[in-house]
Amino acid sequence: MTNTLDVLKARASVKEYDTNAPISKEELTELLDLATKAPSAWNLQHWHFTVFHSDESKAELLPVAYNQKQIVESSAVVAILGDLKANENGEEVYAELASQGYITDEIKQTLLGQINGAYQSEQFARDSAFLNASLAAMQLMIAAKAKGYDTCAIGGFNKEQFQKQFDISERYVPVMLISIGKAVKPAHQSNRLPLSKVSTWL
């Protein structure tokens, strides 16, 4: 399945997975790499992935995710984390652009000043972490479908317990879990509200 529009139309949330359909570390790595191609504000790449690939790690995650069976039946689960200090990525991102001649050092310093100024607001940092990490999450799900895998975005888990259980730095905020695997049966397409109800033309 390589046509982008076909992939978008075919993607649906799957909660029942084939337990005999593993995903290799190489395949999973490729999907994560594709997810990192998602856009982000100032290209700060506000995401971090915690990958639950082994049966043992998924079993440990299970009670944190309220014992949802897809956690252990899927081939892997990826926790999408948002970076509350993504502004600290700015120097690395823009130093490379400056060294390649795409921006001047003056422009680099101006951009870093704007970024660090915005990050004085904790609310801005949190909103940006959720917004931009979610873009990577969606890209991961689309990439997985394009590669023949199914997914489900999971918001129902104990985020505080997750942070403690897996020793997640306070720099990161848990955004969602994404289960990945092969559907044991075709997912049914969920209904959508009419476009006229969810859009306004001006």
UniProtKB/Swiss-Prot annotation:
One of the protein's GO biological processes: response to toxic substance
SUPFAM superfamilies associated with the record: FMN-dependent nitroreductase-like
A GO term for molecular function: oxidoreductase activity
Compartment(s) of residence: Cytoplasm
Documented EC number(s): 1.-.-.-
Taxonomy, superkingdom: Bacteria
UniProt main location, coarse: cytoplasm
Binding-site residues for FMN, renumbered to this chain: 11-13, 68-70, 155-156, 192
Reported induction: Repressed by YodB. Strongly induced by stress due to exposure to catechol and less strongly induced after diamide or 2-methylhydroquinone (2-MHQ) stress. Not induced by oxidative stress due to hydrogen peroxide or methylglyoxal.
Keywords, in A-Z order: Aromatic hydrocarbons catabolism, Cytoplasm, Detoxification, Flavoprotein, FMN, NAD, NADP, Oxidoreductase
Swiss-Prot/TrEMBL cofactor(s): FMN
Signal peptide segment: none
UniProt-listed InterPro entries: Nitroreductase, Nitroreductase-like
GO cellular component terms given for this protein: cytoplasm
Name of the top EC class for this enzyme: oxidoreductase
Entry-linked PANTHER family: NAD(P)H NITROREDUCTASE YDGI-RELATED (PTHR43673), NAD(P)H NITROREDUCTASE YODC-RELATED (PTHR43673:SF3)
Family recorded in the similarity comment: Belongs to the nitroreductase family.
Known role: Putative nitroreductase that may contribute to the degradation of aromatic compounds.
Protein name stated in the entry: Putative NAD(P)H nitroreductase YodC
Gene name of the record: yodC
